[in-house]
């Protein structure tokens, strides 16, 4: 329930079929993964290369750089505020740079998700602009920050 405060919203009902369809579907030019800590699954992440209309969706210039966007969450509250999220983001940024030639990584957290924003800043991400009414959440469009990490 706590994760749904920022991911999809509390008004979205998931079943095993909808979860499987969403989280196991292949992503073009990207990948999905379960985040583990000490061999226990604690979260989820996905990364995908921006192309075409995704640059427009993020209002981000398509200037020839290889740019990836990421979505992630740690779903177990007992693992929050322990540095695990920022460590994971640093590891993912290194993986994207070293294995996929990424030059930039983008995140788009809800502006009121202060805990996540602190973790992202701790990992080196910078807020570069506001994305007003960027994401549908609990029946209305909410404001997000566009955050960037140059690799």
Predicted segments — roles?
Residues 107-117, 134-141:
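Conserved beta-strand-loop-alpha-helix junction that forms the acyl-donor binding cleft
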Residues 121-131:
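Conserved acetyl-CoA-binding loop of GNAT-fold acetyltransferases
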Residues 75, 81-95, 117-122:
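Conserved acetyl-CoA-binding loop-helix of GNAT-fold acetyltransferases
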Residues 17-79, 150-151:
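Acetyl-CoA-dependent GNAT
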Residues 30, 142-146:
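Short hydrophobic/aromatic beta-strand or adjacent loop that forms the aromatic wall/cage
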Residues 98-108:
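Conserved GNAT acetyl-CoA-binding A-motif
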Residues 1-21:
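A short, well-structured alpha-helix characteristic of acyl/acetyltransferase catalytic modules
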């Amino acid at each position: 329930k706590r994760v749904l405060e920022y991911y999809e919203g509390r008004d979205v009902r998931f079943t095993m079929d909808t979860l499987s369809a969403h989280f196991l579907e292949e992503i073009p030019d990207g990948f999905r993964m379960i985040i583990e800590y000490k061999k226990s699954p604690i979260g989820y992440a996905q990364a995908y290369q921006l192309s075409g209309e995704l640059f427009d969706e993020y209002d981000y210039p398509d200037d020839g750089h290889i740019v990836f966007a990421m979505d992630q969450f740690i779903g177990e509250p007992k693992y929050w505020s322990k540095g695990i999220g920022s460590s994971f983001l640093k590891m993912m940024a290194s993986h994207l740079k070293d294995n996929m030639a990424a030059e930039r990584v983008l995140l788009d957290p809800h502006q009121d998700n202060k805990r996540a924003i602190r973790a992202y800043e701790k990992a080196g991400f910078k807020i570069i602009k506001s994305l007003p009414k960027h994401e549908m959440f609990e029946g209305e469009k909410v404001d997000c920050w566009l955050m960037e990490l140059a690799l």
